[in-house]
């Protein structure tokens, strides 16, 4: 996703994702066509491959998706609280997700249902980028949800002057938003109704001033096809 010099600098700061290997394992599971819901009892998986990837690769990805949704601070404090409240006990998956909801102030059962009880995948893309009426000097970006699983989005816009602005799009069903994670300018826009396949993001900037647009440049979302997550409008010289 780090296609311009400025974005590469930002991504170097966010590099070293310890979940990259788990994400590759999950990707191979999806591409194999053998994936089964994580909630399947271990003895009832059709293949050992699907069981192993679900238990280890997708299990690690699950935690990283929670981290992405609620933010680093809430995730860390939630994990510590989970350990303190449930050590030497027998928690269920619902005990974990309820604790994370309390810690973050968000509704998370939708994520748990999609990621654990189904094999629906995450896949977002930039469908189109167009200038609006010249009088307004704004730009319209149409985003599309190709996969069946919804997620909140971090959309980065790099301008020709080298500055970067993040547009954060919550999912309506989560009833909340994560705090900012960096020092770049950040705008929280209207939430995305989870049943809608497309979303229009209007930028208060003319098309000529935009160099590139990226969905999830930190590459934390378990997007099964991120080739459509970047649109470069003006190439660097």
Give the label of every model feature segment.
Residues 28-42:
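Active-site-adjacent bridging/hinge elements
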Residues 52-141, 165:
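Amphipathic alpha-helical substructures
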Residues 108, 122-125, 129-199, 203-217:
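Beta-strand-rich binding/interaction modules
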Residues 1-12:
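Single conserved hydrophobic/aromatic residue that forms the stacking wall/gate
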Residues 217-227:
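Short acidic/polar inter-strand loop motif in beta-rich domains
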Residues 21, 39-40, 54, 58:
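Extended catalytic-interface subdomain
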Residues 226-236:
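Terminal edge beta-strands and adjacent linker/stalk segments
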């Amino acid at each position: 996703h780090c296609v311009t010099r400025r974005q590469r600098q930002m991504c170097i700061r966010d590099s070293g994702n310890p979940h990259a290997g788990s994400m590759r394992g999950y990707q191979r599971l999806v591409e194999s066509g053998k994936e089964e819901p994580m909630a399947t009892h271990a003895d009832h998986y059709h293949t050992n491959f699907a069981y192993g990837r679900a238990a280890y690769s997708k299990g690690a990805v699950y935690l990283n998706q929670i981290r992405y949704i609620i933010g680093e601070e809430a995730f860390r404090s939630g994990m510590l609280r989970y350990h303190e409240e449930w050590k030497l006990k027998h928690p269920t998956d619902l005990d974990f997700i309820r604790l994370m909801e309390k810690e973050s102030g968000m509704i998370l059962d939708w994520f748990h249902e999609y990621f654990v009880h189904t094999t629906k995948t995450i896949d977002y893309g930039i469908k189109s980028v167009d200038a609006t009426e010249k009088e307004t000097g704004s730009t319209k970006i149409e985003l599309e949800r190709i996969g069946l699983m919804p997620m909140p989005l971090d959309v980065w816009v790099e301008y020709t002057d080298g500055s970067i602005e993040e547009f954060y799009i919550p999912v309506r069903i989560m009833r909340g938003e994560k705090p900012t994670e960096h020092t770049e300018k950040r705008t929280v826009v209207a939430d995305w109704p989870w049943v809608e396949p497309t979303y229009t993001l209007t930028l208060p900037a003319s098309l000529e001033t935009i160099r590139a647009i990226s969905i999830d440049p930190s590459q934390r979302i378990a997007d099964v096809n991120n080739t459509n997550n970047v649109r470069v409008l003006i190439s660097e010289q």
